[in-house]
């Protein structure tokens, strides 16, 4: 690991962003399970998607009346709800790139950036980071297991990587 920047943003943060958005913009109280479904079905990192998902009916409790309520929500709304958290990810990427040694910067310029983890599967995140960095951005093959597999390979070959893992 040549340089790194850690940001405490994961799928749970996106889920909480959706819960907050539904409460403040629609006066609708939704639970984690519902917010997670919204994130998976229509979650987006940008309003500019090539093939956007259909609007989604979201059920919850009306905060004003206490009655059950249904609201139609678009992916554009969810992109707005997630915007601040995604900006934090973009800032971390830009900070990391600014600290990257020149030789590695050349490699990144030629090969691009690879995203891993569940958050990388958010629609348009690769496109948004690419627009911010002016670099190609790809989603890793099997993004949910990529980090674990990479860590496992490194641990199996610890002597090979020891020199670059210790700061």
In which residue ranges do the predicted regions lie?
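Short, surface-exposed connector motifs at secondary-structure boundaries
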Residues: 1-2, 106-111, 133-136
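Residue-level signature of catalytic and energy-coupling elements of molecular machines
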Residues: 18, 93, 115, 151
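Active-site phosphate-binding and catalytic loops of NTP-dependent enzymes
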Residues: 28-32, 97-105, 161-165
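Glycine-rich phosphate-binding loops at beta-strand->alpha-helix junctions
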Residues: 106-129
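Conserved phosphate-binding/catalytic loops in two-lobed NTP-binding clefts
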Residues: 127-153, 161-165
């Amino acid at each position: 690991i040549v340089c790194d920047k850690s940001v405490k943003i994961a799928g749970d943060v996106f889920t909480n962003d959706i819960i907050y958005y539904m409460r403040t913009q629609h006066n609708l109280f939704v639970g984690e399970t519902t917010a997670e479904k919204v994130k998976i079905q229509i979650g987006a990192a940008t309003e500019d998607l090539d093939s956007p998902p259909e609007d989604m009916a979201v059920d919850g409790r009306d905060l004003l009346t206490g009655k059950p309520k249904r609201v139609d929500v678009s992916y554009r709304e969810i992109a707005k709800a997630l915007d601040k958290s995604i900006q934090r990810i973009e800032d971390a990427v830009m900070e990391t790139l600014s600290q990257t040694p020149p030789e590695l910067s050349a490699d990144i310029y030629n090969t691009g950036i690879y995203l891993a983890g569940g958050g990388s599967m958010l629609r348009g995140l690769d496109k948004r980071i690419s627009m911010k960095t002016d670099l190609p951005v790809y989603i890793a093959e099997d993004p949910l297991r990529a980090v674990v597999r990479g860590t496992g390979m490194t641990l199996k070959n610890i002597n090979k990587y020891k020199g670059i893992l210790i700061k």
